């Protein structure tokens, strides 16, 4: 691990042909069109007999168009010494990481931060992996890995910087919005951009949206920009801070009331204060457990509060009967039967584990009861 990736050089054998100087341009154009010209290195060099055009190593025969112009042309091996600038990310890392270990090729980008999860067998190579990510991705200034699972109440990760500067204050631009955060102190997942857009697309303009576990505001800011009135809450004081900042940055502060309290208390207050049109709970690990507050609030305030549409996210095993599993868990927490619940598969989290979006209407909870005491509808 003592070798700086910038010091690495590799000798690689390419194919080449020699052509008369005056035919260099036309022949090179043919080869480029057919994607046969080398791209890792300078593809035209001087030669005593004219110009040598460097081709990719995989070429086994020349196109007939080239032979028509230069009948005497023939393929010749041509060794080239490649530096780190010309080597690919995988070629650089393979200098350090032996077969059959798999080189990590994907990571989440959060502004200038690259975040990735490394299996145990790659941890000895974490520093050089980080350095190579920065070398081959100029926009990345910080590379971090997660240390253990997310198991604290605030959902933020314990991060280790493996390369670059220790700077977690960053900005992300999504769907025309800007979200600023301290990535080390809040929860953020760039892969949920489409889900944020999809959920907010279901909201009606001028509706009242209550986001009980809002994080730094990906749902709240979008909903407010759409014209909804939003009450956004998160228990994490750092998320609360960045929520307010992001409302200012995106010009929606007037449409968003921000809260920093327990989600159950927040939900109960919404029912006690007349209800709302939507309740969102984007905490897949435990959101289903908070349905008890919705069940209590709906029963207690059935006559006086609007009955919202509830949208919550949850993990489950897709290989089993996830519909029955999600429904059973939801009904247990609610303390009520669910006549209907829409379930949408959001994304694959890990082998066999999926994130689902579950949607139901609180009004449907009372569908089988008599209507002598209808709940308030506005």
Swiss-Prot record:
Compartment(s): Mitochondrion matrix; Nucleus; Cytoplasm
Principal location class: mitochondrion
Reactions catalysed, as given in the entry: guanosine(37) in tRNA + S-adenosyl-L-methionine = N(1)-methylguanosine(37) in tRNA + S-adenosyl-L-homocysteine + H(+)
Chain sites annotated for binding S-adenosyl-L-methionine: 196, 234-235, 262-263, 282
One GO MF term attached to the UniProt entry: tRNA (guanine(37)-N1)-methyltransferase activity
Gene Ontology process terms (BP): tRNA N1-guanine methylation
Short name of any one Pfam family annotated for the protein: TRM5-TYW2_MTfase
Keywords noted in UniProt: Cytoplasm, Methyltransferase, Mitochondrion, Nucleus, S-adenosyl-L-methionine, Transferase, tRNA processing
Subunit structure: Monomer.
Role, per record: Specifically methylates the N1 position of guanosine-37 in various cytoplasmic and mitochondrial tRNAs. Methylation is not dependent on the nature of the nucleoside 5' of the target nucleoside. This is the first step in the biosynthesis of wybutosine (yW), a modified base adjacent to the anticodon of tRNAs and required for accurate decoding.
Protein name according to UniProt: tRNA (guanine(37)-N(1))-methyltransferase
Species the sequence originates in: Trichomonas vaginalis (strain ATCC PRA-98 / G3)
């Amino acid at each position: 691990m003592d070798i700086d990736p910038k010091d690495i050089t590799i000798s690689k054998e390419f194919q080449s042909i020699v052509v008369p100087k005056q035919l260099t341009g036309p022949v090179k154009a043919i080869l480029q069109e057919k994607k046969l010209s080398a791209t890792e290195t300078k593809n035209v060099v001087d030669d005593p007999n004219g110009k040598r055009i460097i081709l990719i190593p995989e070429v086994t025969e020349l196109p007939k168009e080239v032979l028509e112009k230069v009948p005497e042309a023939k393929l010749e091996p041509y060794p080239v010494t490649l530096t780190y600038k010309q080597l690919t990310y995988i070629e650089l890392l393979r200098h350090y990481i032996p077969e059959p270990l798999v080189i990590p090729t994907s990571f989440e980008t959060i502004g200038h931060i690259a975040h990735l999860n490394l299996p145990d067998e790659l941890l000895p190579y974490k520093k050089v992996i980080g350095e190579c990510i920065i070398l081959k991705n100029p926009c990345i200034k910080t590379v971090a890995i997660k240390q253990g699972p997310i198991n604290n109440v605030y959902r933020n990760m314990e991060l280790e910087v493996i390369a670059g500067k220790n700077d977690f204050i960053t900005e992300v631009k999504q769907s025309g919005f800007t979200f600023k955060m301290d990535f080390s102190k809040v929860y953020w997942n760039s892969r949920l951009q489409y889900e944020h857009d999809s959920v907010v697309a279901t909201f009606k303009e001028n509706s009242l949206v209550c986001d009980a576990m809002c994080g730094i505001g990906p749902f709240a800011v979008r909903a407010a920009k759409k014209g909804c009135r939003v009450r956004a809450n998160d228990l994490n004081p750092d998320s609360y801070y960045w929520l307010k900042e992001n409302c200012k940055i995106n010009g929606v502060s007037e449409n968003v009331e921000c809260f920093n309290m327990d989600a159950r208390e927040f939900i109960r207050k919404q029912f006690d204060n007349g209800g709302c049109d939507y309740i969102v709970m984007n905490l897949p690990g435990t959101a289903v457990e908070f349905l008890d507050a919705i069940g209590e609030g709906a029963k207690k305030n059935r006559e006086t509060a609007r009955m919202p549409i509830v949208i919550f996210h949850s993990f489950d095993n897709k290989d089993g009967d996830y519909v029955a599993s999600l429904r059973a868990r939801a009904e247990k927490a609610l303390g009520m039967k669910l006549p209907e619940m829409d379930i949408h598969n959001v994304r694959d989290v890990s082998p066999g584990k999926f994130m689902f979006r579950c949607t139901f209407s609180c009004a449907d909870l009372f569908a089988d009861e008599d209507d002598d005491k209808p709940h308030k509808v506005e």
